[in-house]
Amino acid sequence: MRESVHRRTRLCAVMSLAVVSSSFFALPATAGAEPVSTAAAADTPVYAIESAKASRTLLLDVAHAGARLVVVGDHGHILLSDDQGKTWSQARVPTRQLLTAVFFVDEQHGWAVGHDAQVLASSDGGKSWNKQFEDLKREAPLLDVWFKDLDNGLAIGAYGLLLSTADGGQHWEDVSDRLDNEDQYHLNGIAQVKDAGLFIVGEAGSMFRSRDEGQTWEKIDGPYQGSLFGVIGTAQPSTLLAYGLRGNLFRSSDFGDSWQPIELKGARGPLEFGLASATLLADGSLVLVGNGGSVMRSTDDGETFAVFNRSDRISLAGVTGNPQGNLILVGQGGVRLTSPTGADTTQQ
């Protein structure tokens, strides 16, 4: 039986902070049958509480809005940094729900998604946000979001939820029936793969790919039956990584036709922590993060990884880099600016 999605607000004490696996849900099977409801413009918003400690609370994702960094997390917190992660300020946000993912298509326009199937949008680099969409009856969170341009985007979430917009989020359409997902497996991650298309991964090893920017989807047989928490395209055409429970990591160089398991081995042996998030850095290297303070870097397009475990063993949910080569990590205990390996300066 799937446990309540609301337990995801305590993910710092359990599995992955970045995504929701099959063990985090136990809602009625009819939840996905509720009609889509766009947030009413007349609704009086409840804004996130401003707090000096917001940067130390549970944070789940990080993105670049041009030179600015934007992070999202619990209680509707959205934080901004204009000095590459040294200091943070809090944005004004019309929700107190947990926000799970954020995506910017350029330095001004971005979207954040979260619980209550909420979609928030910003047109000023994350300084202010408006609520574009929510569905209170669905009782399922959105877990990832992707935009092709200012108009066309997709959001994915629990119970196989797939939303599409063609007008920058002014209207969202439930297009879950585009997926061959009869069991309504939770969809955890979506990514664009260079010169190939879009790829979605989720619960029970589910995988879907699209060669036409999300208009149609093909279900494919993957290499793993456990939950996959995310997917990322590499710098090479048709090449991607899918990652999930217990350190399971797989690489494909043909857009999912075939897969190779990638071993992650640290000083104490094979890594068995859940993998939560990944990023492609400007130099083409890949960085993965997960539970147990795990930070992994690849400089050969994901064929091998060097594994580093932070001494604090915190659960990490998101990662990106800055122009100086340092990493910005988010997760348990907030946001951290670290060395290129993921270590704090005192650990180097």
Task: Show where each model-derived region lies.
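Bacterial N-terminal signal peptides
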Residues: A13-A26
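Bacterial N-terminal signal peptides that target proteins for export
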Residues: E3-S16
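Residue-level hotspots at or immediately adjacent to binding/recognition sites across diverse folds
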Residues: A31-Q348
